[in-house]
């Protein structure tokens, strides 16, 4: 029996939300090394940045928000490569397609869990900007809020780029090239919101805009990703 035939034969009859969630949560916990690498990269960047630019408080405060956000973006892009490639290689995607499971639901669950283990933790670690960049706790709180509201949209854009390059031999190299131009506006708006609050102005409209964009991307992008994943499996 061929590998593809055995994969089809092993396909489950029905897959609901909770079985998918439990399975993806267990897979994420078992691959701790993979999701720890981006977090280590984030910590390395925000730790070494103050050493590189000097200890002048005003300079650190001016560059701190941008440095944390760039580190968050790089760590997010770094962890996207393993989102769908293993599922395609080990037959999980084939099982889901053959079982007529909801691919958009699976994609959404996978991305939500990935966000919890990546940007969710990064948002908490961003509070290290208080001692490292001489930010106030208020500014650090706004920075964390901007990461929470903006990072889901960044993740969805990276996931779309990853799914588009899934069938390519060196597709991981193309993911940042495709995703970063779309992610730069999010980065600009997020850092701008923190700067507005720091100067005493109201940055809530920008945070609301980031949140609206993230909600819209969460509602739409899983369907787009599901279509591209199915095309990659058929090819």
List each language-model region with its residue ranges:
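A structural motif at transmembrane helix-loop-helix junctions in multipass membrane proteins
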Residues: 141, 146-180, 230-235
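Long, hydrophobic alpha-helical segments
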Residues: 64-80
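Aromatic- and glycine-rich beta-strand/loop motifs that create alpha-glucan
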Residues: 2-38
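Transmembrane helix boundary and interhelical loop/hinge segments in multi-pass membrane proteins
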Residues: 28, 77-97
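Hydrophobic alpha-helical transmembrane segments that constitute the membrane-spanning cores
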Residues: 108-133, 153, 157, 191
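Hydrophobic alpha-helical transmembrane segments of multi-pass membrane transport/permease proteins
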Residues: 31-54, 69-73, 178-189, 214-221
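Junction motif at the cytosolic side of a transmembrane helix
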Residues: 2-7, 218-235
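Transmembrane helix segments
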Residues: 161-201, 205-215, 219
């Amino acid at each position: 029996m061929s590998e593809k035939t055995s994969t089809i034969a092993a396909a489950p009859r029905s897959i609901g939300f909770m079985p998918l969630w439990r399975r993806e949560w267990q897979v994420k916990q078992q691959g701790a090394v993979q999701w720890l690498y981006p977090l280590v990269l984030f910590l390395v960047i925000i730790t070494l940045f103050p050493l590189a630019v000097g200890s002048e408080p005003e300079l650190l405060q001016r560059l701190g928000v941008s440095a944390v956000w760039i580190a968050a973006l790089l760590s997010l892009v770094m962890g996207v490569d393993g989102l769908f490639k293993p599922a395609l290689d080990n037959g999980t995607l084939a099982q889901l397609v053959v079982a007529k499971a909801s691919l958009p639901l699976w994609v959404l669950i996978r991305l939500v869990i990935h966000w919890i283990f990546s940007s969710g933790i990064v948002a908490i670690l961003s509070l290290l900007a208080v001692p490292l960049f001489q930010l106030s706790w208020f500014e650090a709180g706004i920075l964390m809020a901007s990461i929470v509201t903006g990072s889901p949209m960044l993740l969805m854009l990276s996931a779309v780029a990853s799914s588009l390059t899934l069938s390519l031999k060196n597709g991981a190299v193309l993911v940042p090239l495709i995703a970063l131009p779309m992610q730069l506006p999010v980065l600009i708006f997020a850092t701008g919101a923190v700067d507005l609050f720091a100067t005493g102005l109201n940055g809530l409209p920008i945070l609301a805009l980031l949140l609206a964009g993230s909600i819209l991307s969460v509602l739409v992008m899983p369907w787009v990703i599901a279509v591209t994943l199915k095309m990659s499996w058929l090819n």
